[in-house]
């Protein structure tokens, strides 16, 4: 019934799209008018639009003309005309929503439309990409569109200096990665003057691959940290205890990836720790022993939860983490709270010191700083509820410009892993013999290497899968009665092994570019962990640019310098060869995505499917499933076993049935909901910290902006006096209960004042309020004399410097306390208390204590300071580490470039305010990326056209 109603009335998404069409028609109607404008007149439109804004006109009213201007600028600068569906995508982004646009639909060009419109108020627009290469490429390529309209474009990339970053953020449109933006925000809040800050606010941002950044990375905070003391021997000692614990000493929750000590485990670990004198006096869970217990729990996780070659690998005597979404190495990333050190101790590698958090923020809270936020991706609808719940972002699916020709086949489900692997190898052989390129998608390094070995090793294949293959024709005839028989006998299969193939996973990251480039060649077989290199096109027939570059490198290695004529001849030969191979691949059905198991999220499955059938090309995708796969084994064992028994499946049979599809979808929904709950729970805790973070950062900036913080210092001095007096003379206490000697000592230590407190206390009828008043007067008088000796200008500078440094020191200690409390607060649930409510209460108490310490430290330093010479300006901490991983690059993007392709060093800012690009005037083109289309309109890439002729600098 519902499907019939949808056919008649359309879906909600269809109705929203229909509402956009009148605006598209308006923009199309304006096209002839803008085509008639000269380059100067087109650029002058920006000035006109800004003047109209100043007079009170709204951005929405300007949208038809602004979009028409961008369309015309794109035609002139790039030779590209945004389609109607791209205009719709731009409208959705301008509304502050997420546009789901399939891969290959031109999201990069779509972003220019809302970017231009929202840059008109001159508050800056940020375009967020997933790596430096894309930020650089897009800023240079799309920057030519903005230059045609008189706007400036900047790019922020790893390794740039603060002045370069400041210049980039000052541009109308700034391209940057999510990591650079987040860390610049944190670093700005560690600066000691507003002039040193690089960002200028958070107005409007468009996030590319928004699902990856705002969902996949939401649980991982951005952290700036510094080194702490070396505790190598402590980690080693704790590590030696874990093998001594029996299985009755702990309980493992595979779904939650957690482990807890049982009552027997608590008793045993307490005994072991006492034997090694690692416990302070008292109970195991006394405050003094929390650190030891914490490290025991982390060591348990390292031994029982984290698996080598699945969660991490050992490379160059170091533990390198593996990204759960891409299966790629993440060099530079380290687990926090001592867990990474526990894994290092387990594996016997060098143990690196822990880091202390100096500043941190999650992407969830960073991107909620923006006044308006929008996003683009090819896969967002499955997470629409989360986008709206967390970020208040609606998701709209934009129609494709050409119909999708990909065929998504039903899943094939087997009872055992061996049966599944046999069917996969059989399918791969069939495709290779027909010349169809195959991309084999796996969820982990371990799974990719199993298939790799089965395709390479005859003995292993025979040992693991031989019993599944018919031995003779009679057996084969019997076997063919099954739902999906293996088509060949064992001798036939063994003749075909080894099967030529390539492996793309964390171990072979260095070869990624070449492997991806060749994945579309007829008969190519590429094994890849959940597609490393998302955003990299697999071109049917091969990659002409890469082959030409390889040929040039061979020529140079042989000591030859090819002429331009030779290069052109070779390029034509390569293109001709690739065109022929592409026809062969298309005839065989296009790229076949063969997935070896379902991922935890339907969205990840859709990303894998999206690797084929791009831009109207034919393609095919299918998932091969086993009941023993992790997803089904953990989340749907009973239901699937019942289905299998009901259907009476035999050995080697595959099933394709609606019941099975429903069970698979139910399992994925369970995992998606669990992960959503985890992210939502993380956000609830981080919101507590975020409120405190915003309060501290905002107050800190106020102090930086202010020329005079004397009133703040006076209030702190008064509060400190009140704290000291009330601590030693409690309110409503009798005089004989006063700690006068303690007060005198505290005043001497904090204020440097030797006051006659004993005499004051002996006075008839004196009260604590009067003693406080005398202490405050004496402190104010002493401080005034100190300020007069220093001079007002020097004193104001000293006050601000000490205040800012004290805020930083206390905030870092506060973060460390919050982290420690957060890791242990879950234990309160055993006392029937709500951990979140407990965290809120404890976090507030810690914040109050931090503020008390801050006031006391600032007061003490200023009261005791000596002016022998002017103090040096405060410096930022040295030896800091910035940590966050981009799932697509598989490494800490803030570290120095490591394995794999990285972006080239970029100029600090590309300011494009000069003459717009003209096809016949190379001098107007400015800096052009090598892989961008040549501005002359030839259709070639720049490096194959004018870039190869005039030797222009490469990007």
Curated annotation (Swiss-Prot):
Any one of the GO CC terms: plasma membrane
Record Pfam families: P-loop_SecA (PF21090), SEC-C (PF02810), SecA_DEAD (PF07517), SecA_PP_bind (PF01043), SecA_SW (PF07516)
GO biological process: intracellular protein transmembrane transport; protein import; protein targeting; protein transport by the Sec complex
The protein's name: Protein translocase subunit SecA
Primary subcellular site in the record, as a coarse category: membrane
Secretion signal span: none
Source species: Maricaulis maris (strain MCS10)
CDD domains xref list: DEXDc_SecA, SF2_C_secA
Entry binding sites for ATP: 86, 104-108, 537
Chain positions covered by the region annotation Disordered: 872-955
Biased composition (Basic and acidic residues): 885-894
InterPro entries membership: Helicase_ATP-bd (IPR014001), P-loop_NTPase (IPR027417), SEC_C_motif (IPR004027), SecA (IPR000185), SecA_CS (IPR020937), SecA_DEAD (IPR011115), SecA_motor_DEAD (IPR014018), SecA_preprotein_X-link_dom (IPR011130)
Compartment annotation: Cell inner membrane; Cytoplasm
Positions of Zn(2+) binding: 934, 936, 945-946
Membrane topology: Peripheral membrane protein
Catalytic activity: ATP + H2O + cellular proteinSide 1 = ADP + phosphate + cellular proteinSide 2
GO molecular function annotation: ATP binding; metal ion binding; protein-exporting ATPase activity
Transmembrane segments: none
Quaternary structure, from the entry: Monomer and homodimer. Part of the essential Sec protein translocation apparatus which comprises SecA, SecYEG and auxiliary proteins SecDF-YajC and YidC.
PANTHER family listed in its UniProt record: CHLOROPLAST PROTEIN-TRANSPORTING ATPASE, SECA INNER MEMBRANE COMPONENT OF SEC PROTEIN SECRETION SYSTEM
């Amino acid at each position: 019934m519902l499907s019939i109603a949808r056919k008649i009335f359309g879906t909600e998404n269809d109705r929203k799209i229909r509402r956009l069409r009148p605006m598209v028609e308006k923009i199309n109607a304006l096209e002839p008018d803008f085509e008639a404008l000269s380059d100067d007149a087109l650029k002058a439109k920006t000035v006109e639009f800004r003047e109209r804004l100043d007079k009170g006109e709204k951005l929405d009213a300007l949208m038809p003309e602004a979009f028409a201007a961008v369309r015309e600028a794109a035609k002139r600068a790039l030779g590209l005309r945004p389609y109607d569906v791209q205009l719709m995508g731009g409208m959705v982004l301008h509304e502050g929503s997420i546009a789901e646009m399939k891969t290959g639909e031109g999201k990069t060009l779509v972003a220019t439309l809302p970017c231009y419109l929202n840059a008109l108020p001159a508050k800056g627009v940020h375009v967020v990409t997933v790596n430096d290469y894309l930020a650089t490429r897009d800023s240079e390529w799309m920057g030519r569109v903005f230059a045609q309209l008189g706007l400036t474009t900047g790019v922020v990339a790893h390794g740039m200096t603060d002045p370069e970053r400041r210049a980039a953020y000052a541009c109308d449109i700034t391209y940057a990665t999510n990591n650079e933006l987040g860390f610049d925000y944190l670093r700005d809040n560690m600066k000691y003057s507003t002039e040193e800050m690089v960002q200028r606010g958070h107005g409007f941002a468009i996030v590319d691959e928004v699902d990856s950044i705002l969902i996949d990375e939401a649980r991982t905070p951005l952290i700036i940290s510094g080194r702490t003391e070396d505790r190598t021997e402590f980690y080693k000692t704790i590590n030696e205890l874990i093998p001594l614990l029996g299985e009755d000493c702990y309980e493992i929750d595979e779904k939650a990836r957690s482990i807890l000590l049982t009552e027997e485990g608590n008793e045993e670990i307490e005994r072991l720790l006492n034997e090694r004198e690692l416990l302070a006096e008292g109970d195991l869970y006394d405050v003094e022993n929390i650190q030891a217990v914490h490290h025991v729990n982390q060591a348990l996780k390292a031994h029982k939860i984290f698996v080598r070659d699945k969660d991490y690998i050992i490379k160059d005597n170091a533990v390198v983490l593996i990204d759960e979404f891409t299966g790629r190495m993440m060099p530079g990333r380290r687990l926090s709270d001592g867990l990474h050190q526990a894994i290092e101790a387990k594996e016997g590698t060098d143990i690196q010191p822990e880091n202390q958090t100096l500043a941190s923020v999650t992407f969830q809270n960073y991107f909620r700083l923006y006044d308006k936020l929008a996003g683009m991706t090819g896969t967002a609808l499955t997470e629409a509820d989360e986008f709206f719940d967390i970020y208040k972002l609606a998701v709209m699916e934009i129609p494709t410009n050409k119909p999708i020709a990909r065929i998504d086949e039903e899943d094939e489900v087997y009872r055992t892993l061996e049966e599944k692997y046999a069917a996969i190898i059989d399918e791969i052989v069939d495709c290779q013999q027909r010349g169809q390129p195959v991309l084999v998608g796996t969820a982990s390094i371990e799974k990719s290497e199993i298939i790799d070995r089965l395709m390479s090793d005859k003995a292993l294949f025979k040992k693991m899968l031989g019993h599944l293959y018919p031995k003779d024709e009679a057996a084969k005839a019997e076997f063919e009665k099954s739902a999906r028989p293996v088509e060949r006998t064992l001798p036939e299969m063994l003749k075909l092994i080894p099967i030529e193939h390539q492996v793309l996973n964390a171990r072979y990251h260095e070869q990624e570019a070449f492997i991806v480039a060749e994945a579309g060649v007829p008969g190519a077989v590429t094994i890849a962990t959940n597609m490393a290199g998302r955003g990299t096109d697999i071109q049917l027939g091969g990659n002409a640019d890469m082959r030409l570059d390889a040929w040039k490198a061979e020529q140079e290695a042989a000591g030859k310098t090819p002429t331009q004529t030779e290069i052109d001849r070779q390029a034509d030969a390569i293109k001709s060869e690739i065109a022929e191979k592409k026809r062969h691949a298309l005839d065989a059905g296009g790229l076949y995505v063969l997935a070896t198991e379902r991922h935890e999220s339907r969205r990840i499955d859709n990303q894998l499917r999206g690797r084929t059938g791009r831009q109207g090309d034919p393609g095919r995708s299918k998932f091969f499933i086993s009941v023993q796969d992790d997803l089904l084994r953990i989340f749907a064992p009973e239901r699937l076993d019942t289905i299998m028994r009901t259907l009476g499946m035999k050995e080697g049979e595959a099933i394709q049935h609606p019941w099975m599809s429903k069970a698979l979808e139910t399992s994925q929904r369970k995992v998606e909901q669990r992960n959503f709950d985890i992210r939502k729970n993380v956000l609830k805790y981080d919101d507590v910290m975020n409120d405190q973070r915003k309060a501290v950062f905002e107050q800190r900036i106020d102090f930086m902006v202010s020329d005079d913080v004397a009133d703040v210092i006076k209030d702190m001095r008064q509060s400190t006096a009140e704290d000291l007096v009330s601590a030693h003379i409690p309110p409503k206490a009798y005089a004989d209960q006063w700690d006068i000697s303690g007060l005198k000592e505290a005043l001497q230590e904090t204020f440097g004042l030797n006051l006659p407190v004993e005499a004051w206390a002996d006075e008839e009828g004196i009260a604590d309020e009067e003693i406080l008043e005398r202490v405050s007067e004496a402190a104010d008088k002493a401080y005034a004399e100190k300020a007069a000796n220093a001079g007002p200008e020097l004193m104001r500078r000293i006050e601000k410097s000490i205040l800012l440094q004290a805020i930083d020191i206390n905030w870092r200690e506060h973060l460390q306390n919050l982290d420690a409390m957060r890791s242990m607060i879950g234990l309160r649930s055993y006392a029937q208390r709500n951990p979140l409510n407990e965290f809120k209460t404890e976090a507030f108490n810690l914040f109050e204590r931090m503020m008390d310490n801050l006031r006391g430290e600032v007061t003490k330093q200023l009261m005791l300071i000596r002016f022998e010479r002017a103090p040096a300006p405060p410096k930022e901490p040295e030896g800091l580490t910035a940590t966050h991983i981009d799932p697509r690059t598989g490494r800490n993007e803030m570290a120095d470039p490591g394995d794999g392709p990285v972006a080239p060093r970029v100029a600090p800012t590309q300011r494009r305010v000069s003459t717009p690009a003209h096809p016949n005037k190379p001098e107007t083109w400015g800096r052009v990326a090598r892989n961008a289309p040549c501005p002359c309109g030839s259709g070639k890439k720049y490096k194959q056209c004018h870039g190869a002729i005039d030797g222009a600098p490469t990007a």
